[in-house]
């Protein structure tokens, strides 16, 4: 039909608009405050790995603001630190967790990673080491030097502090008295109590010193005037234990300091077996730790985990702990509080190799009734391989809140 309009004009096809491709938003482009909030919700176990991503991440992870937010949100974790003395240097490690995509099959994903430590610090086995809050305090120490033909020992009064948030070291005010490796240290209500290990007379005013981290000042505590215990082994020492808001001291006498009464008094013979928890040369104790104000040990002979019941002054078996390898031939064992759980470390020497493996297990705890505590092995795995000369016998395990 020439010249006539078609009955229905065909609609012209309009070209479809090409899809707009939006570039993915990089986490690096997020505002700093938002990143802080995101990181505060992540477990501290992942921080060592995250710090390797970029300088920005590393800056956030070591910032004071991050840990203030974590504290306000009640997101703090208890983290495990392990220190090996080796030669004149010390090697510090912390337990962390690998990202899920990097975890091998049948692996727990946990490992110990090294923390920077400056040269020049006195060997840790000659010092007293303890944690308060997010800081590890390395107190005193022994340094040997040669004077003419004689080898002499010098004690130190210095205090080095590792901030476990930034992994930076600093110096704290020194003690009034220099102390060596035979000093004993404990923590009660956020204060550090260190005794002995000095050349002062046993009745000296400064035989016990007290450090308050809040005021950064040293003070003294009434002296119990107990002598060194001579049957601990090759060294004469006094041992201490901070538990239930009290200080227990074990030497020639066994005494306890009650802060409410402001006095020392002898503990009853029914509590003498508490001594097994602090004496590494004890026939019973292999290692010990305090979790939620309950004292736990690993029995050397039976390799059974036990806890101390103050009501009846007896050690009771921790029920339900199954699945761990036989620890009787694993050398020295360490235990430490891991946020309401027990972390257990032991070593394994590889035959014909100069390598030693460090194993770690995590045991969760449950109180049933009031007279029973049950444990469950959550996982155990190899977390570190070191030179065979490293030994848990001289190592320190510390639990830090960050």
Swiss-Prot record:
Coiled coil: none annotated. Signal peptide: none annotated. Kelch repeats lie at residues 135-189, 191-240, 246-293. It comes from the Eukaryota. PROSITE patterns: FBOX (PS50181). Keywords: Kelch repeat, Repeat. PANTHER family: F-BOX DOMAIN-CONTAINING PROTEIN, F-BOX/KELCH-REPEAT PROTEIN SKIP4. The keyword Transmembrane does not apply. Transmembrane segments: none annotated. It comes from Arabidopsis thaliana (Mouse-ear cress). This is Putative F-box/kelch-repeat protein At1g61540. Residues 24-70 form the F-box domain. SMART domains: FBOX.
